[in-house]
Amino acid sequence: MTTLLIDNIGSLVTNDPTLDAGPLGVLRDAAVVVEDGRIAWYGATSAAPAADTRLDAAGRAVIPGFVDSHAHLVFAGDRSEEFAARMSGTPYQAGGIRTTVTATRDATDATLKSTVTRLAAEALRSGTTTLECKSGYGLTVEQELRSLQVAAEITDEVTFMGAHVVPPEYAETPDDYVELVCTAMLDACAPAAKWVDVFCERGAFDLDQSRAILQAGIARGLQPRVHANQLGPGPGVQLAVECNAASADHVTHVSDADIAALAGSNTVATLLPAAEFSTRAAYPDGRRLIDAGVTVALSPDCNPGSSFTTNMPFCIAVAVREMHLTPDEAVWAATAGGARALRRDDVGHLAVGARADLALLDAPSHIHLAYRPGVPLVAAVLRNGEIVWQTKEVTS
């Protein structure tokens, strides 16, 4: 057993509400001891026990690694021209997904693996240590299974999303596609996934179709999540609560009844601020959700069409500026909130026995993540207690 002491931490975010140190449980002049990839101790630097090795944080802020609970990384092709068209006034429509479906079906395994690996590494450099990844750009039995197998190379949090949109070959017979998803596709894909997701939205899947798909996934041992209420008011949030989904994602257009349902449930509302940023859509009112008692997570929603970024610090800044979260709330949502959205208790916070996933910031406080938007503040990232990325300055 080897131990690592990280000391001289200027500001340590623990997300431990029992410390009587604000909602983030912030400790000053702190230290952390890691043993065999897990948190073994944390507290004041002056009380830190000895360890085999030492990392001097040099006054930096240290936070739990970000937990990204919503990502679409298995794809091929480029939709930058679609983005440019939106910036020229063309409204966003979910149908653009079909463009990526064609490119993904035509791509080699090597191409898909290269893209996923590159984007996961990009997310890691911005502090993300836990990452969910969905299928959804194959939309045949064979292609969806391939996408899940590619996703499994970078994460255990693999989501089957054959119900992303109805593929072109089923445009006239969408119920036949739903039947395929509920039977042969899930039979083949469920063993390769942990979660089942559905885009419950106009232009995608209606309430009855979405419910049937989620129930078919649940019957095969998958846990549900829902893309809900992104493009307009709809039944997605209520369906998510009905199915005890881990999360309802987007939640841009929600009613008082939707918010009350979320607040009284175990379903997390995952906000995806980069999607609104990239589509010029109205932002959901995060303040309204939090004040009502809804548990909120943040995610970049990395995908090639409506939000092509993996950068959680950017999302924190946008959530503070446009969704009216405080910096503390946004950092909590990007760490502990994401863990709640994945129903994980071993990441997103510091506790003895939790996974030692940490990000060191070139800043004295986590507030700088919102205060200095666009600045690459992540100086080092630890996953399972090992430094997996760092700038030269951290150890020089």
Curated annotation (Swiss-Prot):
Top-rank taxon: Bacteria
Binding site for N-formimidoyl-L-glutamate: Y137, N303, G305
GO biological processes: L-histidine catabolic process to glutamate and formamide; L-histidine catabolic process to glutamate and formate
Annotated metabolic or biological route of this protein: Amino-acid degradation; L-histidine degradation into L-glutamate; N-formimidoyl-L-glutamate from L-histidine: step 3/3
Top EC class for this record: hydrolase
GO molecular function, one term: imidazolonepropionase activity
E.C. no: 3.5.2.7
Binding site for 4-imidazolone-5-propanoate: R79, Y137, H164, Q230, S306
Compartments, as annotated in UniProt: Cytoplasm
Binding residue positions for Zn(2+): H70, H72, H227, D301
PANTHER family assigned to the protein according to its UniProt record, in alphabetical order: IMIDAZOLONEPROPIONASE, IMIDAZOLONEPROPIONASE-RELATED
Cofactor: Zn(2+); Fe(3+)
Pfam family, one: Amidohydro_1
Taxonomic lineage from the root: Bacteria, Bacillati, Actinomycetota, Actinomycetes, Mycobacteriales
One GO cellular component, as annotated: cytoplasm
Protein name (record): Imidazolonepropionase
HAMAP family to which the protein is assigned, alphabetical: HutI (MF_00372)
